[in-house]
């Protein structure tokens, strides 16, 4: 069970290591300062119906109650240790999993943990102003739940930095609070976490697409031979599932409401749809194209010696590594990777070790396609002739083999001029953003009420009704 009697809730017996405990208690006020400055805006006195982890067991791991967010019990929670666990891939395959950082991998592991840790506060910063335009109390509660759990995930990474990396780790933990999403001088590490999240459609797309990247990265790190990292990531994945649920159902509810209005009023033209105060399907497709493409960049270069080294060293595995049927060394294996040659997209095989970023990206794309398929069924069930599609993986890319090329959603390699002629048919324009923003000029906070542009969910949180008071405004 998790010990909530200590200043920092934990299940790692923190009280037995007084030096580590003092270091984390010294970092805690800095974290709270960051939360007050960069957490959800003007919300510190709200009492929010939130879940808090009380156990790391699969059944009954969380409890729900009203909490003021600055009083949320952020803590350090790892899955229980498996004494028989081994390194399951790379050159150390078959060795006992490491309980301490191998000296030769110290800087590499620190970089991996810092990169993951940096994403957690970044998303809170990106979303901090959205409470002012929430479409319902239910949705407001959901964004707050996502935010406090991203804060807890930051604590998870900071614990590893403090516990295993000494002064370097403490300095990195301070830097995680110093960087700011979108800051010109001190931005977050990864590009997608410096993009603005200006409206709720962008938020839902982010939690569907970009939080799902988080899932796949955590799954790869949960295979790590460094056991404390693996155990940390496994519990983070338990919390992450709700974030993706918020995104998928949020976009789905917007699509549902748009389809309802289109059917009721017998309109199809996007301008007619907009005149009725909902988000037209072509604009939803443009948002999809943007968030999907910037998230694909998070996986890094298609061919990467760093990814090969992480795997060979046993630091970061593949998605569901232990369920894959191969030698888990990959010395002679190959994997297909695409690039642009002579104005065409060409696929060729490369050493599988160097293509691990691309493999993880492909695993992600497969799962994303299933979610988009569920959105499509909402449209089909309404009898509306419109198809949501994932663009080609080379579309609108800034990192990897497709960076610097202009590729259409259908995979055609274009000239820069042709791209510019069609760019805002495929990506949101300033007018698109302005229209979506115009729908969100105020917030809807009466229990059970929802903004016109989004349908109610199928059910409430934790078996509560839709008119439950999910947030108390004190």
Feature map (PLM): residue ranges:
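Amphipathic, well-ordered alpha-helical segments in soluble domains
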Residues: 119-126, 153, 210-217
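Alpha-helical membrane segments in multi-pass integral membrane proteins
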Residues: 230-244, 288, 292
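Inter-helical turn/loop segments and adjacent helix faces that build the functional surface
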Residues: 129-141, 216-236, 250-282, 298-315
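Active-site-adjacent structural elements in folded domains
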Residues: 199-205, 216
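Long, hydrophobic, well-ordered secondary-structure blocks that form the structural core
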Residues: 129-185, 237-244, 248-255
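Terminal targeting/low-complexity segments that flank the catalytic cores of oxidoreductases
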Residues: 1-134, 138, 164-197, 201, ...
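Mid-sequence acidic-hydrophobic segments that form the walls
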Residues: 164-167, 210-225, 243
């Amino acid at each position: 069970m998790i010990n909530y009697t200590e200043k920092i809730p934990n299940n790692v017996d923190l009280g037995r290591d007084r030096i580590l405990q003092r270091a984390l208690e010294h970092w805690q006020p800095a974290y709270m300062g960051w939360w007050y400055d960069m957490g959800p805006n003007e919300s510190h006195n709200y009492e929010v119906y939130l879940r808090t982890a009380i156990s790391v067991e699969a059944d009954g791991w969380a409890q729900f109650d009203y909490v003021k967010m600055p009083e949320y019990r952020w803590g350090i929670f790892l899955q229980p240790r498996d004494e028989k666990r081994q390194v399951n891939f790379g050159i150390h395959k078959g060795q006992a999993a490491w309980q301490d950082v191998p000296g030769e991998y110290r800087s590499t592991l620190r970089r991996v943990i810092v990169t993951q840790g940096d994403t957690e506060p970044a998303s809170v910063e990106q979303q901090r102003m959205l409470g002012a335009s929430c479409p319902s109390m239910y949705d407001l509660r959901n964004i707050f739940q996502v935010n406090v759990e991203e804060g807890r995930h930051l604590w998870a990474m900071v614990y590893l930095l403090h516990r295993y990396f000494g002064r370097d780790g403490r300095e990195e933990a301070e830097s995680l609070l110093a960087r700011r999403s979108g800051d010109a001088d001190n931005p977050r590490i990864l590009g997608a976490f410096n993009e603005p999240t200006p409206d709720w459609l962008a938020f839902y797309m982010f939690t569907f697409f970009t939080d799902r990247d988080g899932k796949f990265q955590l799954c790869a790190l949960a295979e790590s031979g460094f056991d404390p990292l693996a155990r940390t990531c496994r519990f983070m994945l338990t919390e992450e599932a709700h974030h993706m649920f918020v995104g998928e159902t949020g976009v789905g509810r917007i699509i549902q409401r748009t389809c309802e209005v289109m059917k009721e009023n017998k309109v199809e033209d996007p301008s007619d749809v907009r005149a009725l105060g909902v988000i037209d399907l072509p604009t939803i497709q443009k948002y999809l194209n943007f968030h999907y493409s910037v998230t694909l960049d998070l996986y890094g270069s298609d061919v990467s010696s760093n990814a090969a080294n992480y795997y060979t060293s046993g630091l970061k595995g593949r998605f569901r590594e232990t369920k894959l049927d191969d030698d888990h060394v990959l010395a002679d294996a190959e994997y297909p990777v695409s690039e642009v040659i002579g104005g065409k997209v060409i696929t060729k095989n490369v050493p599988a070790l160097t293509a691990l970023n691309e493999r993880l990206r492909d695993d992600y794309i497969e799962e994303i396609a299933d979610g988009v398929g569920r959105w499509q069924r909402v449209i089909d069930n309404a009898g509306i002739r419109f198809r949501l599609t994932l663009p080609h993986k080379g579309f609108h890319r800034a990192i990897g083999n497709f960076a610097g090329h202009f590729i259409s959603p259908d995979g055609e390699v274009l000239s820069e001029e042709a791209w510019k002629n069609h760019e805002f048919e495929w990506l949101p324009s300033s007018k698109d953003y302005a229209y979506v923003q115009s729908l969100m000029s105020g917030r809807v906070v009466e229990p059970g009420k929802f903004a016109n542009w989004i349908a109610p969910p199928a059910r409430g949180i934790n078996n509560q009704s839709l008119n439950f008071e999910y947030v108390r405004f004190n």
